C-alpha cells in the first residue's frame, strides 16, 4: 500500500442525485427538487414522487432552473445534508 493511500481517508458510499434548482434565495444554499420514479409492485404503473432538499453551494454559482448534481455529505445544518458537485446544464 502506498503512503498516499495511508494518509487519505476514504469517503463512504455517498448518494449522488440529479435535480433542478427551484430556489437560490438563501446564502450559500440552494433548494433542489429531486424526482423519483418507481414501478407499482402490483399494477406496474410508474409512480413519480418529488422531494425538495437543501444543498450547500459554497460559491453561489447555481441559479433557478439549473440542472445540478448533488452529493450526500455530513449534516451542515438542521436541514442541509447535500452539497453541490457540478452544474450539468445552465437554465436558458
Swiss-Prot record:
Pfam families annotated for this entry? Ribosomal_S17
Span of the secretion signal? none
Is Cell inner membrane set as a keyword in this record? Answer: no
The entry's cellular-component GO terms read: cytosolic small ribosomal subunit
Which is one GO molecular function term here? structural constituent of ribosome
**Do you know which InterPro entries this protein is assigned to?**
NA-bd_OB-fold, Ribosomal_uS17, Ribosomal_uS17_bact/chlr, Ribosomal_uS17_CS
Please give the Gene3D superfamilies that the UniProt record associates with this protein: Nucleic acid-binding proteins
Superkingdom of source: Bacteria
* Keywords, sorted A to Z: Ribonucleoprotein, Ribosomal protein, RNA-binding, rRNA-binding
Name its GO BP terms in alphabetical order: translation
Per the entry, what this protein does is: One of the primary rRNA binding proteins, it binds specifically to the 5'-end of 16S ribosomal RNA.
Stored PANTHER family: 40S RIBOSOMAL PROTEIN S11 FAMILY MEMBER, SMALL RIBOSOMAL SUBUNIT PROTEIN US17M
Q: Which family does it belong to?
A: Belongs to the universal ribosomal protein uS17 family.
Subunit structure, interactors included: Part of the 30S ribosomal subunit.
What is the protein name given in its UniProt record? Small ribosomal subunit protein uS17
What is the species listed in this Swiss-Prot or TrEMBL entry?
Corynebacterium diphtheriae (strain ATCC 700971 / NCTC 13129 / Biotype gravis)
Q: From which lineage does this chain's organism come?
A: Bacteria, Bacillati, Actinomycetota, Actinomycetes, Mycobacteriales
Amino acid at each position: 500500500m502506498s503512503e498516499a493511500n495511508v494518509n487519505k481517508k476514504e469517503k463512504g458510499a455517498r448518494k449522488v442525485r440529479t435535480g433542478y434548482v427551484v430556489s437560490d434565495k438563501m446564502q450559500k444554499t440552494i433548494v433542489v427538487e429531486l424526482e423519483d420514479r418507481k414501478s407499482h409492485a402490483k399494477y406496474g404503473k410508474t409512480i413519480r414522487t418529488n422531494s425538495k432538499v437543501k444543498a450547500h453551494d459554497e460559491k453561489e454559482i447555481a441559479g433557478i432552473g439549473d440542472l445540478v448534481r448533488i452529493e450526500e455529505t455530513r449534516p451542515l445544518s438542521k436541514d442541509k445534508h447535500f452539497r453541490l458537485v457540478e452544474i450539468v446544464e445552465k437554465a436558458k
